[in-house]
Amino acid sequence: MAVRIAACGHDVSVIARGPHLKAIREKGLKLVEAEQEVVATNLVATDVIRDLEPQDLVLLALKAHQIEAVVDDLQALFGPETVMVTLQNGIPWWYFQKLGGPYADRVVRTVDPNGELFNRIDPDRVVGCIAYPAATITEPGVIQHIEGNRFPLGELDGSESSRVADISSLFEEAGFKARVLTDIRSEIWLKLW
């Protein structure tokens, strides 16, 4: 995602570690796809989240079990209007937030055992997103896109906001399919099935 969004001329910062970070800083981040290779050299790359200033949009693409370890650092990325799009597989920590009904605001203990994410990340800044593409790091600084192009997204309360429409437009500008859904939770189950 970072390479495609940066290729559209947007300012992009990435968090990486070790040899991957070193390669990005030295040569840029390369995306290898079936018909083309694109290298983004206009990225800010760091391994220290707190080195970055507040962002307009944060794409949280960590494994669910990795998020709690960085929840304090994520706060540095949040300004008053920052939106965070979550790209985890499975049931997300925010599943019962803004849902209503008898399960409203329950903590999903299997992915957020101590309720840290539930309590520390304001659900008003979260937009849910389901990542269908498959990709892998083939060598430091090189991402191989294997298949898939869909990133359906939606507000946790099912509303059709201007911010989710703007994110969809950004993703589509970068060449992704990004349909806005009024029930993002159903899409989670569709992917899990």
Model-derived segments and spans:
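Rossmann-like NAD(P)(H) cofactor-binding subdomain of soluble oxidoreductases
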Residues: 38-42, 46-138
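Internal alpha-helical scaffold of NAD(P)-dependent oxidoreductase catalytic cores
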Residues: 23, 77, 118-190
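Active-site-adjacent segment of FAD-dependent monooxygenases/related oxidoreductases
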Residues: 34-40, 156
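NAD(P)+-binding Rossmann beta1-loop-alpha1 motif at the extreme N-terminus of oxidoreductases
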Residues: 1-33
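Short, hinge-like loop/turn segments at secondary-structure boundaries
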Residues: 30-33, 101-104, 143-146
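Oxyanion-binding "anion nests"
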Residues: 193
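Flavin (primarily FAD) cofactor-binding/catalytic cores of flavoenzymes
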Residues: 7, 16, 72-74, 163, ...
